[in-house]
Amino acid sequence: MEIARVVIVVLGLALVPWGSRCRAEETPTEPPRLASDPHTDARIAEALRRVSPDRIRQTIEKLVAFNNRSTISPQDEASIKAGKGIGAAREWIKSEFERYSKDCGGCLEVKTDTFTEQPAERIPSPTEITNVYAVLRGSDPKQAERMVLVTGHYDSRNSDPLNGTDPAPGANDDASGTAVSLECARVLGKASAQLKFPATIIFLAVAGEEQGLDGSKHFAQMAKQQSWKLEAVLNNDIVGGNLGRDQDAGIVRVFSEGLPAAAAEIEIKRIRMLGGESDSASRELARYIADVGRSYDAGVKPLLVFRLDRFLRGGDHSSFNQQGFAAVRFTEFREDFNHQHQNVRHDDATGIEYGDLPKFVDVDYVARVARLNAATLAMLASAPAPPAGVKMQTKNLDNDTTLAWEPSAGATAYEVVWRSTNAADWEYVQTVGRGTRASLKVSKDNVIFAVRAVDAAGHRSLPVVPEPER
């Protein structure tokens, strides 16, 4: 596709005042750009420099010191006082969020989500499970209901998922992901006075992951039942960048679902008919993370993996997918399974040291992953709301494309992005001004389109793929 040949015409809505229509109908003077061009907010870049590998190390070591954080480990008052078990870990995480809030002038609301999980395969008796989270409220009353979320699970396990007493350090799986969530809370909380994020950011640590994603299922169901406008979920699970020889410390995998888990059969048929198998909301979130990775020097680049998760494994992002939310998983490039779900031991015959211990975690790598997460959260929370009601006219047989959408809160302009149907990421972008309707001399038969909102500072929303409309 030769982008120099693309012509865009922007049209205003028929019912807006004539003066506004004149401004909206101005034809863009600039040609389409490559979608891979970076766009950086210097204030966000400055905030990312405050991510501390030392603090991340301290967080991981502290979580490991609780000995066994299994969901079925002790959480009575005596265990909490002794600093052992998941109850003690829960209280410490809560105290850390509270400390971060104090440091940013009370910017964080610290909360818990507690429920009782009934007996199941990995839950031998009714068990209390608590998710701990902190909320950084959006500064714009018109956008504060919009939410983005980062999470990791703070429970751990050893070789036996029903062993709640013997050591289960869980340094990589998943103290590393919990450390990312905590560090994002600390850094973005302090930065919020300057950045004044219009939308709300939630920093979450869930339990029950190793027993069946119990904590995240409950939290995602709560978000659905309460009609949260949750636009993005970043799940960090096994982001310790183990120090194995084949590890690539410059890459973090980002997994995303294709066909939405929550889609009804009629919607799946429509997706297949339109060729939208790679355009779920989660897939668009993954592409957004790739864009952030090009725009900010986090020290690690996202490798987009277009599947829900690794083989034989699962994660908390899928709980949110099941409820219809866009959610992705961050995981290190190459895993060392000797240091996951293993009893701590040394095999004299092979010389292999088993166990998920802190010494096998690369805290500098975790810090880089935290920067990528923080940059993504900051960009999403700074951006306008994604356009709603995005439609593509299909009533006539023609080689052009007409798109229309509803105005977004906080937007000063809109962009149309597109890519070839066989391309993994967006290839071209065209700014179309303040109008809410655009006609393009590009055939809808040959490409995938989406529309995103942009504010005056250049923060871009998640892109929204249009629905056909006759």
Q: PLM ranges: what are they?
A:
Residues 440-460:
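Beta-strand-rich modules
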Residues 64, 239-260, 304-384:
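Active-site-adjacent mobile loop/cap segments within catalytic or ligand-binding domains
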Residues 456-470:
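Extracellular fibronectin type III
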Residues 29-84, 297, 338-339, 348-350, ...:
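N-terminal capping segment at the start of a domain
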Residues 399-410:
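Conserved aromatic anchor
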Residues 33, 55-137:
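A non-catalytic alpha/beta surface segment that caps or lines the substrate-entry region
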Residues 134, 150-151, 155-213, 373:
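Alpha-helical metal-binding/catalytic segments enriched in His/Glu/Asp
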Residues 206-318, 323, 327:
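Metal-dependent peptidase/peptidase-like ectodomains
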